């Protein structure tokens, strides 16, 4: 049995899903638990829900997939700011400290948050990052009738 926990967080509409042998067992958006529309925080309650629904402990999950690669997003962000410079400089100046301090190093952030679900979760190597646009494509393709 192969289990995958999918996580979307820190942008908008945080959510979690769990797949077992390629089949979606449960999925939930964090806003359903926090009642905060478009909640961007770490989806603690959504993860708790999908794990409980699937009757799986976090330590037993084979892979944890985050919806995007932080360095690719940072690269896109820089390209956008350069393309529109000097417009948007205030936004750029505000965003950079957050990116340089936290967002580029999300693997450690995710690991620390995941430990809140299961203190025995110790394998940071289970955390992977997918390309954002491939995540969108996969969410459309895999449940479709196409092979």
Give the ranges of each region predicted by the language model:
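Short acidic/glycine-rich loops and adjacent helix/strand connectors
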Residues: 1-147
